[in-house]
Design a protein with these regions (language model features):
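Gly/Trp-centered helix-boundary motif
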Residues: 1-90, 95, 102, 116, ...
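Primarily residues marking transmembrane-helix entry/exit sites
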Residues: 2-9, 141-144, 186, 198
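Generic hydrophobic transmembrane alpha-helix motif, especially the helices
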Residues: 53, 84, 88-89, 97-103, ...
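Short helix-to-coil transition segments within interhelical loops
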Residues: 56-61, 98-99, 178-188, 192-196
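Transmembrane alpha-helices
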Residues: 72-88, 187-209
Length: 209
């Protein structure tokens, strides 16, 4: 099962990032528009054309090419957003769990507040703020980056809560106490000793995300 799943993921990634080798059509190229071939059915139907395997849309663009080019953007945005939220959430959760006190209380209350807001609503809110702060032309140019930030900022609380809980368990173990006694800095203890031991649940959440 794992091998089959990995093979399917490899095919998806290959087709998405090497789409130019698979199909000659670029849906973003205005010259690819052909209203005469609009709404062409898939190639296996009676009126289908062999050059359009999945048919065309209302503007005559090849549907297979549109899906593949779109999947590339979706994968880039998805992975970048998860990495951003992972770095932010783990950083806050790890430091909150390690130092504790008012800082931990502040971070956890912040996660509680944000978890009351649906992720999609938070992403739309961030995008709306971005539209108000920058010009429309700049927003169009930075649309992908704004989307990555909007999704990432809405997903970090789950990483923060898990990493904080795991850090609370790890920081009371003997290897952390030994490192503290011999004078190892807090930064080294957190990111070199504790972080590798709490990565497993974090990576599981990241994979699901």
């Amino acid at each position: 099962t794992a091998i089959i799943s990995s093979l399917i993921l490899f095919i998806i990634f290959f087709c998405s990032f090497f789409v130019e080798l698979i199909t000659p059509y670029n849906p973003f190229d205005p010259s690819s528009l052909s209203l005469m071939e609009a709404f062409t059915p898939p190639s296996w139907t009676e009126d289908g054309l062999s050059k359009f395997i999945l048919g065309t849309d209302g503007q005559g663009r090849d549907m297979l090419s549109t899906i593949l080019y779109g999947s590339r953007i979706s994968l880039i945005v998805g992975f970048s957003a998860i990495i951003f939220s992972l770095i932010l959430g783990v950083g806050l959760g790890l430091t909150a769990g390690y130092f504790g006190g008012k800082y931990e209380m502040f971070v956890m209350r912040l996660t509680d507040v944000q978890l009351t807001v649906p992720s999609i609503l938070m992403a739309l809110l961030v995008d709306g703020i971005a539209r108000g702060l920058i010009s429309r032309e700049m927003h169009d140019e930075m649309a992908i980056y704004v989307l990555i930030f909007a999704i990432g900022i809405s997903e970090w609380p789950q990483f923060a809560r898990v990493s904080r809980a795991a850090t609370l368990v790890e920081k009371n173990k003997d290897y952390v106490s030994a490192s503290t006694i011999i004078g190892v800095s807090n930064l080294v203890i957190m990111f070199k000793h504790i972080l590798p031991n709490i990565l497993r649940p974090i990576l599981v959440i990241g994979t699901i995300g």
